[in-house]
Regions:
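Structural recognition of the beta-strand scaffold that forms the well-ordered cores
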Residues: 80-85, 114-119, 143-149, 183-188, ...
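Second-shell loop/turn segments in exported
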Residues: 116-118, 154-161, 193-196, 247-252
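N-terminal secretory targeting modules
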Residues: 1-84, 88-107, 271-291
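Active-site machinery of serine-nucleophile hydrolases
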Residues: 108-115, 124
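Oxyanion-hole/transition-state-stabilizing segment in secreted/luminal serine hydrolases
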Residues: 90, 94-104, 125-169, 174, ...
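Proline-centered flexible-loop/turn and helix-kink motifs
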Residues: 111, 180-181, 215-217
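Catalytic His-Asp segment of secreted/periplasmic serine-dependent ester chemistry enzymes
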Residues: 193-291
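Extracytoplasmic/secreted proteins, especially bacterial periplasmic and envelope-associated proteins
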Residues: 83, 123, 127, 163-170, ...
Length: 291
């Protein structure tokens, strides 16, 4: 007989949804070894999409990026830092028209730490879980991992705050399973003008109460939302979405916003990695785009 591991029941949300009535399976002979997310997936229902490891292999660029990361792992055996997330993390690899080039930020803050970018545009917690369980961190021993995930759960897949919270909890547990010596810097979902902004606030409130108290010694939680506000309002000038044609709701930091974000977390990253903080370059805020 098998039940959901107690380690996963430490999450209040997982406990409420999954651990009150433990899953019971009839097992013949020794049970196969399972990752935390594989075990959680056995209990998941259609109401729990954020914790079911899900691939996007039908999307050509996604499958190619995943394979490229697997192929590159031997050359990243000495990486000190992982960045795990969605398009906001993926953007460090990109130069976006008309004038967004994120590579200088990567070269300043992360290349010296031999960092590996595990950001995939459009990913949810479910996709991150699948990637973790399908080799993307195999053989690695990073000192720290920066995790920023969840905005696609609420913003584009219309998952609830509770589902997204459970998904983020599952990502944390899965990283701890695969990389037990790695320290995790968990970032709150960044602010946005999408209708999901209130859900994101609820998610961040949960993450702050759940992780900020030091209950999980592997996790440091930071909510850096304040840097994206000016005069009490979201500063659209540091997102690139309003400058697209047609304009879109602010979601992705532009080059300036990304640099501000890297600067805001730098002292914590340096502490987790065990090196000297990198001095930020001065920045000046442009005027907000006109509607």
């Amino acid at each position: 007989m098998r039940t959901l591991p107690q380690s996963l029941c430490s999450s209040a949300v997982v406990a409420a949804m999954l651990c009150v009535l433990p899953l019971t399976l009839q097992a013949q002979g020794p049970a196969p070894t399972q990752t935390p997310t594989q075990t959680v997936a056995l209990t998941a229902t259609i109401r729990d999409p954020a914790i079911v490891p899900t691939d996007r292999l039908s999307v050509p660029w996604w499958a190619q990026r995943h394979q490229a990361i697997l192929d590159s792992l031997p050359s990243h055996a000495d990486t000190e830092l992982l960045l795990i997330g969605d398009s906001i993390t993926n953007n460090y690899d990109k130069a976006l028209p008309p004038n967004e080039d994120f590579q200088p930020i990567w070269q300043q803050y992360y290349a010296p730490r031999k960092a590996l970018n595990l950001g995939f545009s459009g990913d949810t917690t479910a996709n991150v879980l699948w990637r973790l369980d399908h080799g993307e961190v195999d053989g690695l021993h990073p000192k720290a991992a920066i995790v920023l995930i969840g905005t696609n759960n609420t913003g584009f897949f219309h998952e609830t705050a509770e589902e997204t919270e459970t998904g983020i909890d599952a990502v944390v547990k899965d990283i701890e399973h695969h990389l037990p010596e790695t320290k995790i810097l968990l970032l709150g979902i960044l602010p946005t003008r999408l209708p999901s902004k209130d859900l994101n606030f609820d998610v961040n409130s949960y993450l702050g109460s759940h992780y900020a108290g030091g209950e999980d010694p592997h996790v440091t939680y930071m909510d850096i939302s304040v840097i994206f506000y000016q005069g009490g309002s979201l500063n659209d000038s540091i997102f690139y979405d309003p400058y697209l044609n047609p304009p879109r709701a602010s979601l992705h930091p532009n080059t300036l916003g990304q640099r501000m974000m890297a600067s805001a977390i730098e002292s914590t990253v340096a502490r987790l990695v065990g090196d000297t903080p990198i001095k930020p370059l001065p920045v000046s805020l442009p005027a907000s785009p006109q509607p």
